[in-house]
């Protein structure tokens, strides 16, 4: 399998940025840990601040973290009775927050990252890759999306939410699943493209909802096989016309592309409104984002 780690090695320190990571599957999930390693190898400064437990489907819920219960953190990654927040014993960049995804990324943005970076705050927020897709009716309830929209709207930090159709919850210390490696490489490609486009990385109050298709060692098995499609989160039947792209002023629906046509190795990238998590219905803003992503975008046949 070829890897975008080759691309990562080419990222100069001048392009390296400060990144905060979170998710809703838990801080010790293999997907986010694999992505952390890839981002670190690319030369970025990365702080991971994720929930102590699986918080899937919690949307934009937010409450102060509490002492970890007697069961401990997910995947036995911290013992029962641990403090409300904590860090890996050997790597202070890896942090848990015993609360919701929004609370977790907020802790990372406001407390943990500035503490590790001499007061500096993140320049980019990345959530996921989520275990499972986040399309259509799933989007408003997704903690992965909720954390990204908090970063984009409240913290005013450009944010990207990543989700992958394949895989089951896996501990950080289990053998790294094939899907985690592929999704980390694909997520790095999107991230690097946005960074290389220059600041501001995204228009204010917008986020990207990125979904990866099902992968296996026999189908969609190499990063070079994937095509990135610019899509909508919702269908847009009653919305104003979209940006003029790929010969149309109506972007394809991400659910149709990822769930029905995903076997063609399509990655969907949808521009989201951080205020309500739906598609950003502004053709001019969509065009700005298209221009940033244009080096990797393709059109559907």
What residue spans do the PLM features occupy?
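Fungal secretory targeting signals
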Residues: 1-17
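Structural recognition of the beta-strand scaffold that forms the well-ordered cores
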Residues: 18-22, 46-50, 96, 123-128, ...
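A cross-family phosphate/adenosyl-ligand binding-site feature
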Residues: 19, 29-110, 116-117
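Solvent-exposed, acidic/flexible segments
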Residues: 25-32, 98-102, 137-144, 176-184
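Solvent-exposed loop/turn segments at secondary-structure junctions
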Residues: 25-28, 52-57, 100-105, 130-135, ...
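Internal, conserved structured core segments that host functional sites
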Residues: 108-109, 113-167
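Electrostatically charged, flexible surface regions
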Residues: 174-301
């Amino acid at each position: 399998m070829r890897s975008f780690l080759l691309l990562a090695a080419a990222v100069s320190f001048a392009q390296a940025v400060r990144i905060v990571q979170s998710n809703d599957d838990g801080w010790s999930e293999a997907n986010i840990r694999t992505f952390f390693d890839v981002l670190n190898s690319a030369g970025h400064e990365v702080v991971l601040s994720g929930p102590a437990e699986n918080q899937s489907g919690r949307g934009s819920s937010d409450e102060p973290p509490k002492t970890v219960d007697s069961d401990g953190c997910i995947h036995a990654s911290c013992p029962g009775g641990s403090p409300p927040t904590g860090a890996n014993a050997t790597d202070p960049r890896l942090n848990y927050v015993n609360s919701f995804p929004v609370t977790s990324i907020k802790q990372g943005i406001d407390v943990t990252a500035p503490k590790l970076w001499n007061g500096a705050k993140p320049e980019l927020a990345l959530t996921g890759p989520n275990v499972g897709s986040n399309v259509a009716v799933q989007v408003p309830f997704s903690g992965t999306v909720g954390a990204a929209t908090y970063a984009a709207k409240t913290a005013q930090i450009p944010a990207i939410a990543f989700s992958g159709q394949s895989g089951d919850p896996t501990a950080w210390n289990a053998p790294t699943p094939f899907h985690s490696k592929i999704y980390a490489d694909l997520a790095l490609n999107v991230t690097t493209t946005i960074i290389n486009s220059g600041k501001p990385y995204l228009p204010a109050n917008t986020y990207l909802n990125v979904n990866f298709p099902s992968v296996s060692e026999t189908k969609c098995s190499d990063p070079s096989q994937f095509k990135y499609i610019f899509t909508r989160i919702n269908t847009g039947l009653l919305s104003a016309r979209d940006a003029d792209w790929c010969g149309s002023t109506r972007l394809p629906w991400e659910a149709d592309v990822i769930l029905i046509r995903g076997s063609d190795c399509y990655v969907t990238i949808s521009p989201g409104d951080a205020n309500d998590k739906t598609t950003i219905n502004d053709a001019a803003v969509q065009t700005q984002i298209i221009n940033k992503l244009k080096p990797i975008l393709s059109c559907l046949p």
